[in-house]
């Protein structure tokens, strides 16, 4: 995203050699537009019908509010082909197993269960209060949600102003058990519920394992949009039960209650909107990299998935360390 607001690009190529590339293209400024507007400008109406499925139903918001730069960062050529071709991979033991295995190989393993309550940056050092004890470091890389960073760190006015521009998606999940003989045999997109007017209803349900009739079915719901009121969480949970019934997959009941075996509401896909994207939000944050012994990474600096987040972290380390 860095430089896009000014029609400039500068970084490492997505090749094995990762050679440095830079240049100018005024058309890059269009990436700050909401994706709906970008498609209209380029006369690409059919793209929305294909891309709304892996974007909006996966919790990344509506095309009339999310800047194009985020959409194209996520749905690059390879990723789009994999979705269209049904080549979607999952990990047998879940994605957390990747990081557990990685952590086991690190010379300095991650310290878990760390409750950070205070960060003070002074005298070219970083003082962090973690689990009630103060520790001192040379540099700080923040990957936690930046909009909450001022709640425990000695943020400057510039940091507070920029981070206050961040919003996020309220993306909810419910794992439910379906009535016997009513189980779906595959996952399913509910296209009409990917439109803003149907906010708070099931956009997709996920059927993970083949030929396991009693597996939990996972429902996914968005509960907020730009400029709108945040919907009530419990009401959206009730909506999903009605939706599954209407889709022919009624939730099984036990002792008169629906069998919802797990549910959650998540801080998901932090982002800025088009007006701040176009005003150079990313360039302003980039200009702060290294100041006060602090660097900024995490989802907001790239995109809300593992691939892009890791890519930015790699790029940050190459540039500054």
How should these model regions be labeled?
Residues 1-66:
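Mobile amphipathic helical/loop "lid" adjacent to a hydrophobic cofactor/ligand pocket
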Residues 36, 40, 99, 103, ...:
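Non-transmembrane alpha-helical segments in soluble domains
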Residues 67, 91, 95, 306-309:
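Conserved donor sugar-nucleotide recognition element shared by glycan-biosynthetic enzymes
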Residues 46, 118, 147-148:
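Glycine-rich nucleotide phosphate-binding loop and flanking beta-alpha elements
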Residues 74-130, 135, 139:
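Helical element adjacent to the flavin cofactor pocket in flavoenzyme catalytic cores
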Residues 137-139, 147-295, 302-307, 311:
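C-terminal segments that line or cap access tunnels to active or ligand-binding sites in enzymes
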Residues 29-30, 93, 231-234:
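Soluble non-cytosolic domains of exported or imported proteins
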Residues 309-321:
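Internal hydrophobic alpha-helix adjacent to the cofactor/substrate pocket in enzyme cavities
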């Amino acid at each position: 995203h860095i430089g896009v607001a000014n029609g400039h690009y500068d970084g490492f190529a997505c090749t094995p050699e990762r050679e440095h590339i830079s240049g100018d293209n005024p058309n890059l400024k269009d990436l700050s537009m909401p994706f709906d507007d970008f498609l209209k400008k380029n006369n690409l109406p059919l793209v929305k019908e294909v891309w709304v499925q892996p974007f909006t139903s996966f919790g990344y918001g509506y095309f009339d509010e999310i800047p194009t730069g985020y959409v194209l960062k996520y749905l690059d050529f390879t990723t789009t082909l994999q979705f269209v071709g049904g080549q979607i991979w999952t990990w047998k033991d879940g994605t957390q197993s990747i990081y557990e295995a990685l952590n086991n190989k690190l010379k300095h393993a991650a310290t878990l269960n760390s409750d950070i309550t205070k960060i003070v940056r002074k005298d070219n050092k970083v003082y962090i209060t973690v689990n009630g004890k103060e520790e001192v470091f040379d540099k700080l890389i923040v990957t936690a949600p930046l909009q909450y960073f001022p709640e425990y760190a000695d943020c400057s006015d510039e940091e507070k102003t920029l981070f206050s521009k961040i919003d996020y998606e309220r993306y909810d999940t419910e794992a439910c058990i379906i009535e016997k003989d009513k189980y779906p045999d595959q996952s399913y997109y509910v296209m009409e519920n990917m439109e803003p007017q149907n906010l708070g209803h099931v956009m997709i349900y996920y059927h993970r394992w083949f030929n396991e009739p009693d597996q939990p079915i996972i429902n996914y719901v968005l509960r907020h949009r730009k400029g709108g009121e945040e919907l009530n969480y419990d009401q959206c949970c009730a909506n999903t039960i009605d939706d599954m019934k209407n889709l022919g997959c009624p939730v099984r009941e036990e002792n008169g209650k629906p069998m919802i075996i797990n549910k959650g509401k998540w801080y998901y896909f932090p982002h800025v909107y088009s007006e701040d994207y176009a005003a150079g939000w990313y360039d302003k944050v980039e200009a702060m990299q290294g100041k006060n012994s602090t660097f900024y990474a995490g989802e907001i600096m790239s995109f809300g998935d593992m691939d892009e987040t890791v890519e930015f972290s790699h790029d940050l380390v190459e540039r500054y360390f």
